[in-house]
A protein has these predicted regions:
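Active-site beta-loop-alpha junctions enriched in small/polar residues
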Residues: 1-3, 27-29, 55-57, 82-84, ...
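Alpha/beta catalytic cores of nucleotide-metabolism and tRNA/nucleoside-modifying enzymes
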Residues: 2, 8, 106-109, 113-116, ...
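Glycine-rich, positively charged N-terminal anion/phosphate-binding segment
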Residues: 4-75
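Alpha/beta enzyme core
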Residues: 11-12, 63-93, 101-189
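Hydrophobic faces of well-ordered beta-strands that scaffold small-molecule active sites
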Residues: 22-24, 50-54, 77, 119-123, ...
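Short secondary-structure transition/capping segments
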Residues: 33-37, 89-92, 132-133, 163-166, ...
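Short, hinge-like loop/turn segments at secondary-structure boundaries
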Residues: 39-43, 95-97, 137-139, 168-171, ...
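Pocket-edge positions in alpha/beta enzyme catalytic cores
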Residues: 54, 95-96, 171, 238-239, ...
Length: 318
């Protein structure tokens, strides 16, 4: 998610789940080719498995960007065909590509020629006045013919005009049954569902109905304690750290970030929702929001915020 799933966010999320695939922010192919590669592509070994999400519509550019990214060691390269923002549309990529499946096929074929890891596609079920019942299977069939075997389908249409990106995540109705149908019609493909999933319980239910995976975005960001802690149970792993453990596991990373010239709020802005719905959550957010942006702020701010949580928990227990 753009402006959200940066390296700091991914490191934080990895403290809660060892198995879930983490995705970068979308990076455009021209940015990878011409921009500051280390800043855009660097990630830590602790983040694996991690996927790079690319935006673009020029097969040559996407191939070059994939070739560059290959040397960084990502576990997956994902082409975004689902983002509806005006900025993305003006570059002729994102959700607008749902109207051009043959071009998407050309793009992924070029990317696969430069990749030694899976190339995947994230898409919508359709855009504007398209009929998803007809458009989505045709899109999957066309792109799969170019060698892609893994699709993440956001189970909503995108309206390219008249709705903001936020509205496009909320107003178009969800159609989970259509995505489930696609798995039945294309059993050879890996089909993952995105959109409207806010809990591990929902994820388990969808997986039990035959889907290969579930992508959870904003719910995992805003309420990571409920969505990510325990997620490894989906793989049969008994790994569910306590929230306080997660915070303490972040402290060495934060100290290293600060020692390298970084600012505290660059990391802690992703941690605000960790205690969502629990006693002390408000105090946690208040301390981090008020103090992490100050010059010279260090891990003592995080310790102070955590004390607000533990203090409230002890007060209620007493």
């Amino acid at each position: 998610m753009m402006d959200w799933t940066d390296r700091h966010c991914r490191v934080f999320h990895r403290r809660m789940t060892r198995r879930a695939m983490l995705y970068t922010e979308m990076v455009t192919a021209p940015a990878v080719i011409h921009g500051p590669k280390a800043r855009l592509l660097d990630f830590g070994a602790e983040e694996h498995p991690v996927a790079l999400q690319l935006g673009g519509s020029d097969p040559g550019e996407l191939a070059r960007a994939t070739g560059i990214a290959r040397d960084w060691g990502y576990d997956e390269i994902n082409l975004n065909c689902g983002c509806p923002s005006d900025r993305v549309q003006s570059g002729c990529f994102g959700a607008v590509l749902m109207e051009r499946p043959a071009l998407v096929a050309d793009c992924v074929a070029a990317m696969r020629g430069e990749s030694d890891v899976p190339v995947t596609v994230k898409c919508r079920i359709g855009v504007d006045e398209q009929d998803p019942q007809e458009v989505l299977p045709r899109f999957l069939e066309t792109v799969a013919a170019a060698g892609v075997r893994h699709f993440i389908v956001h189970a909503r249409k995108a309206w390219l005009q008249g709705l903001s990106p936020k509205e496009n995540r909320e107003i178009p109705p969800l159609d989970h049954p259509l995505v489930l149908r696609m798995k039945r019609e294309f059993p050879e493909l890996t089909i993952c569902l995105n959109g409207g999933v806010t809990s591990l319980e929902q994820a388990r239910d969808l997986l039990a109905q035959g889907l290969d995976g579930v992508m959870i975005g904003r719910a995992a960001y805003h309420d990571p304690g409920h969505v990510l802690i325990g997620a490894d149970g989906l793989w049969g792993m008994d790994h569910a750290p306590a929230r306080e453990e997660v915070v303490r596991a972040m402290l060495p990373y934060i100290e290293a970030h600060l020692a390298g010239g970084g600012r505290l709020h660059q990391v802690t802005r992703h941690m605000l929702g960790l205690f969502h719905g629990l006693p002390g959550a408000r105090g946690w957010r208040q301390v981090l929001s008020a103090e992490a942006g100050r010059g010279g702020a260090g891990v003592e701010v995080v310790e102070r915020a955590l004390a607000r949580v533990t203090g409230e928990t002890e007060r209620l227990a007493g």
